[in-house]
Amino acid sequence: MALIQTNKDLISKGIKEFNILLNQQVFSDPAISEEAMVTVVNDWVSFYINYYKKQLSGEQDEQDKALQEFRQELNTLSASFLDKYRNFLKSS
């Protein structure tokens, strides 16, 4: 089942905003631990999921599919961000 356009637009907006949040992060000393950063990023993902979940439209299965796609996209962005953070920690 394809996502309805409203949900596609909402997911796209959320992904852009999340990416902006990640790109605004400045790594500096003293750095927090990798585990702490993972916790922070997981909290951000949960915040975005909960915020956008309330705005999804359509039948429940359409909302669930949109939410699953959104979560996958946020997790992909998070993994890339955390890789950059790990590299920062190694170079410090």
Swiss-Prot record:
Monomer. Forms a heterodimer with free alpha-hemoglobin. Does not bind beta-hemoglobin nor alpha(2)beta(2) hemoglobin A. GO terms for cellular component: cytoplasm. It is found in: Cytoplasm. Acts as a chaperone to prevent the harmful aggregation of alpha-hemoglobin during normal erythroid cell development. Specifically protects free alpha-hemoglobin from precipitation. It comes from the Eukaryota. Its main location: cytoplasm. It holds the Pfam family AHSP. Keywords: Chaperone, Cytoplasm. Belongs to the AHSP family. This is Alpha-hemoglobin-stabilizing protein. GO terms for molecular function: hemoglobin binding. GO terms for biological process: erythrocyte differentiation; protein folding; protein stabilization. It comes from Bos taurus.
